[in-house]
Amino acid sequence: MKLNFTEKGSGPVAILMHGMFGSLSNLGNLARHLTPTHRVISVDLRNHGDSPQSATMDIPAMAEDIVQLMDDLSL
């Protein structure tokens, strides 16, 4: 699944993921603090924010989504 994400900054990669009922907008303060020294990727998990909806909502599927995103970004 192609997740919605934002990417800012440069340096070591930090992938930020929100908790239940959240979205990447919840990660703004943390992202702002990390951006001066890191490449920050903030992610909307499946069924959250602007990412696609799916009937499947479990940890293995969400983990695979993150692996796919990392592959797409050559991380």
Language model features: what each stretch is:
Residues 6-53:
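Conserved HGGG/HGGXW glycine-rich cap/lid loop of the alpha/beta-hydrolase fold
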Residues 1-2:
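N-terminal cap/lid segment of alpha/beta-hydrolase-fold proteins
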Residues 32, 42-75:
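Active-site loop/oxyanion-hole signature of alpha/beta-hydrolase fold enzymes
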